[in-house]
Amino acid sequence: MNKKIPTIIELPKLEQEKFDALIKKYRDKYIRPSSEIVDLVLSEDKEFLELIKSKQMSLYILKLREKVWQEYLNDEIDFNAVLMKDLHKLLDTPKEILEILLSDSKIIDKKGEELVSTIKEVCGEYAGRVFPYIYRLSLSNTQSRRSRAGKTFEVIIYKVYEILGYDYDSQSKVGRKMFDSVGLGKKVDSILPSIEAFKGRRNKAIIGTMKTSLRERWQEVAEEIERTKIPVIHLLTVDESISKSKAMEMANHNIIIVTFDWVANSENIRTMKNVISFEEYLFDEIPNILKFWKK
């Protein structure tokens, strides 16, 4: 009887396109935006307000990222469950597989322990036979997690700016075209206090970019500096594996690394003048720039 069950090595093209569209639709419906989760966590946990009051910004960023990430993973679990539960309703091949498995198992004739055992067997075989769909969903989740990690970091930093009353323009706030109009590319995420300030005097504006992980991607920032002739750029990161050699190389490209206090003040890094903590960045560097514009 099993010969009647469709054998799927890869998704049929039409179903792949439909499944990809379903993933996007369900993801938008069941996974909350980073900004919504950040606001929720901050409203429910007063610890973060205390951390800001005591100027422990490294801990604030670390703990908030962890909490927001956990909320995201909870959303992802619900999203996965609902999508897989609805799979047989929405796509023909999973529907056919499940109907054959249920028919072959004669599940409607069974009761008690035999019914429970049959349900387990059907669920296991169904999961195995629709695995190409599960695999494609897993690839989508991996991609989404990468982009979500970066987006969440941005939202957290911008929320800090707002709480501290710092004016800023970001690509997500004013649009890509505004940044393009002053010659800045997509590698620049924000300007403090504003694009107008940058236009008026470049060396009295803080140009910022954010990367959760440096690896080789910081070189994209160096290329942006070279292309746009920006005097200096602040690269905010939560990457804790910053070597002295990498920091020195970035210093040669006028990149100031903004990172956790314990990283900036670690034995290998603390002598590097282009590596500063979130605390120094938020309570020294930015206020000094903003003072200039308040004259």
What are these model-predicted stretches?
Residues I77-L98, V116, R145-I156, R176-G185, ...:
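Short, charge-rich amphipathic segments
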Residues V122-V130:
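Short glycine/proline-centered loop/turn elements that form peptide/ligand docking sites
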